[in-house]
Amino acid sequence: MEDASQLSNSQNDKAKDETTRPQYTMSGILHFIQHEWTKNELDRTRWEAERAEMQARIAFLQGERKGQENLKQDLVRRIKMLEFCLKQERAKNYRLTHNGEEPPSLEESPNENSAPSENSHLTADLDAYINDAGEAGGSFRQGRLLLKRYLEEIGYSEHIMDVRSFRVKNLLGLLPQADLPSSERLNGRKEKSDSNYSDSDDGHDDAALDADASKAFEEFDFLNNMDAKEKGSDDDWAGKGASFEKLIKQYKDDPKVKRRSRTSTEESEEKTSNDVQKNLETDVPPGIRSAIDAAAQEELPVRRQGRRSANFGYGNGNELDVALGMQDNDNMDIKDEFKDEDDDPNAQQVKWNIKVTLRSHLDSIRAMQFHPVEPVLFTASEDGLIKLWNLDQKKDEKHNSGGTELEPVYTFRGHKGPVLCLVLSPTGDHLYTGGIDGNICCFNVPSSNGDPFDSYDPRVLTETLTGHTDAIWSVAYHSSNSRLVSASSDSTVRLWEPGNGEPLIRTIGAPKSGILPTSVDFVSTETSHLLAAYTNCYAQIIDIDTGSTVMVFDFGAVTGSPTMNKIVSHPTMPLTLIGGEDRTIRYFDNTNGSIIHEAIAHVEGVSSLAIDPNGLYLLSGSHDGSIRMWNMEKRSCLQEISAHRKKNDSAVTSVAFHPSRSLIGSAGADSLAKVYVSGSN
Amino acid sequence: MTAATENRTVRRNGPGTKRADWNNWSPLAFEEMDSALNIQQYIQQTIKANPADVATILTPPLDQDEGVWKYEHLRQFCIELNGLALLLQRECIPETCQQMTATEQWIFLCAAHKNPNECPAIDYTRHTLDGAATLLNSNKYFPSRVNIKEISISKLGSVARRVYRIFSHAFFHHRKLFDEFENETHLCKRFTTYVSKYNLMQQEHLIVPILPNQQQQQQTTVQ
Ligand SMILES: [Zn+2]
Ligand SMILES: [Zn+2]
């Protein structure tokens, strides 16, 4: 109570000159406490969001660190190996000069023929081998330890590389991905072939992964050839490597220990991926399946390889331990690292982190879209304005804005009242916006490097398309014939040709009375087809040439009649995604109108969807304040970002992918737009 | 979904909402607005209820922090002034309005530029509104909409002074347009009451005779 009175005192001091209010009303105090509590809550959510961002950053940096440490260790071990080599040479020299004292198995002549005889001995008896080692002195044992570590190391570094390339691939999703696995393989090989032990690695790989046996044999052959060229003076080492390999093979042929090294994680992993495949086969119609398979083939090998190499490193250690009669020792920590990396799903995922918050709108932002090529963004807001942002903008000293923040380069004025939707032409030269005023404004897009305080050019607004009698909620641009489609709450969908004397070409009424169109998009695989979503849980494909319905999507049994807020076409497949007020994202097959998949995706209504240009990732925004990144193929959530605060019951209103850059964006009822970059930047 | 959630009014202008249904939900008591942007919600709700009722619109909820209240009102003025700017784009062209003037007494320089510039009226209008939006969103001066720094309050006065010139230019040079806008929004009346109530501008600068006492004043000076 004392605190409260003090606080209200101080408040009153401030307000004393204004009015004389009752000093300590109960409701006043309660309200003050409530207010403070709200503030604290807000701060807390902000801190949590920051914390999550920082954690993602930390995880990434830790990964980087591991990679660096690993590289360092690798180099140190190589040095040690060379030292060991030298010691071996000296020991051999000694043995040669003291002939007879040494066991015949270790008597190695400089010529290549010695290797087979050595092998036959080694494969004959494990104990003998260890005894040999004992006789040869601690250095040999130490050498094997190093060898073991090194083998693990190869596996481990390969794993790291996989994680990285997977991450890069994931986040880019824009690069031709088919290249990556092969180039990665080459890298892996290069690293292996640097080592004299490489053939033993691959021999091991062969045996452990009999599923991939044939492929691995090819690798093996390839590497043997490479090694044969490289061997030269290190012949005896190559011989030893081969002997190890034989030893390991023999060990693995032993039924008792066979496959023990295969961890359950790999099995379950393979099982799940098989299940995924199976699901795809059962759920997806043929046309889509091939496309998904193609995507999956780009995706899966990398994952599998990463998994395999991790396991490979793991198994290698174990098996060598047993084969060489060694106990696990100081290598334990490395294995734990493997495990962590394997078990932690975040380690292999792309994380999007906020790059910039765009503050300039004064009321809820309703729509956003990136320029097709440039790092340029357009936002439309309930404050009646559309703003053009250049994300690469250099701070211009000409303006008296008093800040160092990113400011819009241009502000478009054309609508009376809230602007609700926007779309860019494929070149990014023209902008079309729809507003609550029922008009569509056609703008020429000014230079993204212009002066925000340039003089007004009325030619920027080229045309205003009038005809709708109520708010326009969605516009879509037909890429090939310069036509525009708009959806209005006057219940019609209209087709326009801007620049034509009579721009309105067709008016398409609602399929049922009482339902209103909410969202439109063109079908990527059939350019004369238009997707339209409606209130009351309805969506259809319309032929824009005739205005007739081609297909009505079958929602099945749905409780209530939730509005379908956003409809988007998959960029390459006859697949349609719809986000609904009922928190659900639904996948539809355009060929028969049936639901392929539906899932509750958010805590509150899904307001917006965006698909990356390759059709691999889906971004969704919701009035629960979060945006979520989804893997389209697995339909799993990869990341959630709490993005925007609520105004009334609205939060995130729009999400977007940059068509050609690794950028995503979100916009919200809190008047803010945010741009995110993937974690590696 | 549970029955409780379904029964709750969802205050959201979702896609498909008709213009007539925009923000058309049962008013919420200020105490029940639990979002961070509750002041903006509250202001817009009272405007929606009756834009002519300036006194109610400008009456803060009990114990409302005055800084935030003034700040959010100024934001709202700038939002609605975009409507006036849109109308001015139609007929306020550099050929007729080469300078930003109201009465012939002053030529206003545009402060959006590093060196104040003698922009034509339409550019002054656009630049001033864009500059105001930037300033009101500035991380330096207004990093939070929940808590306004004392030092930033003074910025509100300069924003108010500049945007007021848009009213005065429209009133003295585009009277028909001004009346059309004012009849619908009562924005100049609300703005004049606001800056007077919170002493953001000096009375002699409020040259548009929109309030009853201002009109009397003008009549007495004319006589
Ligand atoms: Zn003018
Ligand atoms: Zn200017």
Swiss-Prot record, chain B:
Protein name in the entry: MOB-like protein phocein
Positions contributing to Zn(2+) binding: C92, C97, H169, H174
Keywords: Cytoplasm, Golgi apparatus, Membrane, Metal-binding, Transport, Zinc
Membrane-protein topology: Peripheral membrane protein
Cited InterPro entries: MOB_kinase_act_fam, MOB_kinase_act_sf
Biological function: May play a role in membrane trafficking, specifically in membrane budding reactions.
Broad class of where this protein is predominantly found: cytoplasm
Gene this chain is encoded by: mob-4
One Pfam family, short name: Mob1_phocein
PANTHER family: MPS ONE BINDER KINASE ACTIVATOR-LIKE MOB (PTHR22599)
GO MF, any single term: metal ion binding
Region (Disordered): 1-23
Family statement drawn from the similarity comment of this UniProt entry: Belongs to the MOB1/phocein family.
Subcellular location: Cytoplasm, Perinuclear region; Membrane; Golgi apparatus, Golgi stack membrane
UniProt KW Zinc keyword: yes
Keyword Cytoplasm found: yes
Lineage of source species: Eukaryota, Metazoa, Ecdysozoa, Nematoda, Chromadorea
One GO CC annotation: perinuclear region of cytoplasm
